[in-house]
Regions:
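Eukaryote-biased recognition of intrinsically disordered, low-complexity regulatory segments
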Residues: 1-21
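Short, contiguous acidic and Ser/Thr-rich linear segments
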Residues: 20-31
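Ferredoxin-type iron-sulfur electron-transfer modules in oxidoreductases and energy-metabolism complexes
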Residues: 31-50, 97-278, 286, 290-293, ...
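Short, structured protein-protein interaction patches enriched in aromatics and acidic/basic residues
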Residues: 53-65
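Glycine-rich phosphate/adenylate-binding loop and adjacent beta-alpha elements
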Residues: 70-94, 99
């Protein structure tokens, strides 16, 4: 079959890009989408034209390197399929396909369909690890893990960090990715000592990378090739509230001006509130204290030895 490809071509992050049309000829249904692009690139090179740049590595849907939009849908729209696994049998002769890179401020374009996803790496570096004493490997059965917790951790660990969730989200949110990485370790006994620190650090890192906020569209789950569920975002939010509470909780110290009236106080003084701070002022003061804590920077990670994978 023959296809028309409208491909986004851009030399660098600072260059001006545009769509350029190409003809992909003699495409067989047994080809993968990337094999079709390989064939097109060979034709471009033979004509001394620059080939189309795109990310790829394992081509087995494992590494998360590949990924771009096909007709506005991440990975082409086949449920649970990365673009490297996408078969050309899903397209028809004469189709026009529009290819463009992930669109997000946190993913600057490197060239053509390639984007810089190092923002994901920095989120993982902020807390995507566990720490343990160095030495010989512990017995495999020394720390028991419940079946439910192991299943949750395994489901979260399936995230390959391809970035489709960010590309599909109207706000370019990375909450599905971040929640998967947090839930993976927070679900295991080995991840409990640094659970609060991990959650706070990774959420702060995500915010600093200028990703958007989640507004419950659910587009991220719909395009995720590994079926990462939205419930992990809920788990992350609960862990974040838990971490903030543990970090900032302290006894509510009632200001000394708030006193119960003694027997000698007159009824007029009690009625007029003389000697007492209004209750709403106390609540407002406490609210401002908590807000100030929440806006503070997260603590530095503890200097511990990370476990090698």
């Amino acid at each position: 079959m023959n296809l028309t490809l409208r491909v986004w071509r851009q030399q660098s992050a600072n260059a001006t890009g545009s769509f350029i049309s190409y003809q992909a000829k003699d495409v067989t249904p047994d080809m993968s989408f990337l094999e079709m692009l390989d064939s097109l690139n060979e034709d471009l090179i033979s004509r001394q034209e620059p080939p189309i740049a795109f990310d790829h590595d394992c081509r087995e849907g494992i590494c998360g390197t590949c990924g771009f939009l096909i007709n506005g849908v991440a990975h082409g729209g086949q449920r649970g399929t990365t673009v490297c696994q996408l078969s050309m049998r899903f397209f028809k002769d004469g189709d026009t396909l529009t290819l463009e890179p992930w669109r997000a401020r946190a993913f600057p374009i490197i060239r053509d369909l390639m984007v810089n996803r190092s923002a994901f790496d920095r989120i993982i570096q902020a807390g995507g690890f566990i720490s343990a004493p160095t030495g010989s490997a512990p017995d495999a059965n020394a720390i028991l893990v419940r079946k439910e917790d192991a299943d949750t951790a395994m489901d979260a660990a399936a995230c390959i960090g391809c970035g489709a969730c960010v590309a599909a989200c109207p706000n370019a949110s990375a909450m599905l990715f971040t929640s998967a990485k947090i839930t993976h370790l927070n679900s295991l006994p080995q991840g409990q000592p640094q659970r609060d620190e991990r959650t706070l650090s990774m959420v702060v890192a995500m915010r600093n990378e200028l990703f958007g906020s989640c507004t419950n569209h659910g587009e991220c789950e719909a395009v995720c090739p590994k079926h990462i569920p939205l419930e992990f975002i809920g788990k992350m939010n609960r862990d974040l509230i838990r971490a903030l509470w543990h970090r900032h909780r302290q006894p509510l110290v009632i200001p000394s001006v708030v006193q119960l009236p003694s027997a000698e106080d007159s009824h007029e003084q009690l009625h007029d509130g003389v000697g007492a701070q209004p209750q709403e002022d106390v609540h407002q003061q406490r609210h401002e204290e908590v807000q100030a804590h929440v806006q503070a920077e997260s603590p530095e990670p503890a200097a511990t030895a990370p476990v090698s994978s």
